[in-house]
């Protein structure tokens, strides 16, 4: 059975710290043993470590399966009887009774067996990483009292990996958390357009069931809509619930509008009110008192049909002040809920600010903001899967009921009643096709981590991008510390998809909480409290950088705080309730990795956060000189580095594994992933960073993965940058690079493509993977082994055969000679065609891996497939013109020119710069952070020493001792909103260490005199020079460049297809045609519109003329013209084509004989329309 938690807990324990904000003397990475010494410019000490970045996924899944880890955490919170997600569904479903109530079936105690195969094997063999789920089913015969109990298998249940992902059919997927409107009661205010009156309405929204809506209209009557049907007076509903007119008058006598509504209501008594409601809900059906009573009961008061869920009941009670302090049990509506809602609405319309409910509780009367995070909650992975299981179980319930009535009572056992197919199908459907189960973004470790922390308002039960307005997409004050205001997509999904903030967590109701330090009587304590958005609205919160002394008292008498709705003001320190735990509290992980974020415009910061996720892993990773302190935790939690589970000594190290002898005497071997292909074709490779004999502590990084160096996230390279125009070659964001980066593989990346082919049974016989391919020369087969599969290490290019395969052709009538051959040689002479797997057009590389699956090896293959072969081809891509590079501040560009290193501008000591960026890329875009990063990068690369002979300079007073001097190549961190200040940067630039010749290259203004590499002359003005962190993005020119000579045509228009995927041509569009016409290039234009496009007859005749060396014939009529005629004729218009002398021209259908003859002679296949794949063209 499965025991323990999903994720080991490495270094995430909370420690109490003093509230003092004195400077920490060691690296901020000190919570992780063996971390690189990155010195920090942070001025504030954070009282709380960053929580586990994958907790939003793992905690939710552990709740679903009810793991021991989750139960222990629930018990520590004081939850005496914690119920897991699966248990909850089984309790809801049980008991399933037959129609007479004589038999029942109950479920309990869900449990899992061991997973069927480890993660790597599942990926390799296209299996699902799953564990068998068993439940205890109990059948009770109420007539005899007989009880039969069995353990029933409920199917294989997909399990979450340690990294918070699922392996479904061999591919790694992520279930994204969904942001939805919470069930509850919502009051709204609108202005009537005709009378300009303020109108109020309220919706009672359940988790499952019919909506109940009340409103006050412009005639000042209170109405109700049940299940979105026609409006009727609210008093009808109250009477249907058993209230008399006297009771209504007694409860609502204070309200003029309720009295007028009662007067206009013509129904008398409960029965008439029930029948009136029934007629509105079921028009056309004969109403009876019983059916009307049952309908109303079922709609709102029966748990099977109506469910507010725990969160809905909590929200209703909180809003209306009901059942204060009582345990929440009922999840249906109550009569008191309905009455209290109506009273709240009436008082709201009358402008009252508070209302006292029957329990004596006074509640504020106000409208709700639907975009407030107090009213939006998260459906995390566990709840999403739980809902899907609930759907499957309810389908199974129907089957069980039917079987109870049809089967022999004596022979019934739980096993015979249960059909698990609907449950298995529902789970499969969710993981395979749901909008929220997504193909994992594995471009680099950060993209995977961000994907798991994504919040989506789209999906089933959510919004659609077409209907979502500006309000729901906008940044809201309640997002602070919960959802990042920066990181969101740029396209049509902007604002609908967000990212969880660094410190945020999800509470049991699904609301996002963020931590604050408690302030008591003006003193900041170490006590941390997590608040939801609506709780936070009731308090006054100070910023994390409000100055405080050693004892935690505010140094200033008036403190800058924020109140409800994001209002900012100064208040006395005694009025402050809470204080932020960290300046980076409001941003997400990717945004927190942008240094000097505080100096960047939000639009550019958004691009910077998004482009970090597109960075390609390079052959050799390099951590940034200027980081933010977030790099280490992000890399560890992303799960691509190898972390020591126990303290001990490294016993053995090789490229493939590391063996650690732990202090407790146990030995553990960690296997490295070597050159594996990620979901996005990038290379995932792990390499050890420890040596044999080294001492390691638990939680220490012992091997780097892709995009990591020494356990820190390393998405790009530190390059020497000059910010200047250069001969116009870096106009419009183009970038000029030094050839050194090409020659030394500085920005080289490895990309791995997977090619797959299978041999199936066809109607004409079995396909065969073989080296014996018809009409293929020996040179082409040189790299194939005896099975017909390419050898590992072979260099291949487009059109080369990777796997030889032949498919039987249709048998034709054999000639006597062929029959003789068949008789002599048997099957050898049968006709087969070449259907080999070839390298697609435009691709090349080296074969690095082959996997063969066949029935002989007991591999699971789809029906009809005999053998399956996968070939992995790796390509080393050097940086080239047209590739896209970017910094971390949204400063992106395409490489316009690669110059020889000797032509690049150089520093006075002869060092040529690596990259030239245009000055125009900064001022208008307002991302000044890139300039500050460039300056600090130079300081970090050069090293510095602050002259303290005459005392510490004013600008360095706040710097700790470790920042007074540093050796060259010292990595530094400047955390967001708490980093290096401009005056500190200026002082450090004046304090940099000289080079080996004793010269300082860059002055105190961050500029250097540069010399032109071509002439040796200095440029007229000093140029900003420094080190910037540059990333190579996934938009590579090799994937985009494309050319076509001949290829597939569209079936209807006979024009070439478009796009690289279809091996299409370049469209000569309307604007291009007009350009040709403007130049009077009539013959060229005619040629483009006919024989180069869709003149089917002319195409072949021209081909024939070229082959024979004859003159090009006259073009014919394009196929698209014939299509136009047909379109017009389909509209019943009689359209004829007339010659110049007015005679009708008949357009012949089909191919003419000349065409057939020419095609046969030239060996052209004219039937090739919309080819199924590019391989067919080779």
Curated annotation (Swiss-Prot):
- Keyword Nucleotidyltransferase on entry: yes
Q: Care to name a GO molecular-function term for this sequence? A: DNA binding
One Pfam entry for this protein is: RNA_pol_Rpb2_45
For bias type Low complexity, the affected ranges are 17-33
- Entry's Gene Ontology BP terms: DNA-templated transcription
Q: What keywords are assigned to this protein?
A: DNA-directed RNA polymerase, Nucleotidyltransferase, Transcription, Transferase
What EC number(s) does this enzyme carry?
Answer: 2.7.7.6
Name the top EC class.
transferase
Tell me which family the UniProt entry assigns to this protein: Belongs to the RNA polymerase beta chain family.
Role summary:
DNA-dependent RNA polymerase catalyzes the transcription of DNA into RNA using the four ribonucleoside triphosphates as substrates.
Q: What is this protein called?
A: DNA-directed RNA polymerase subunit beta
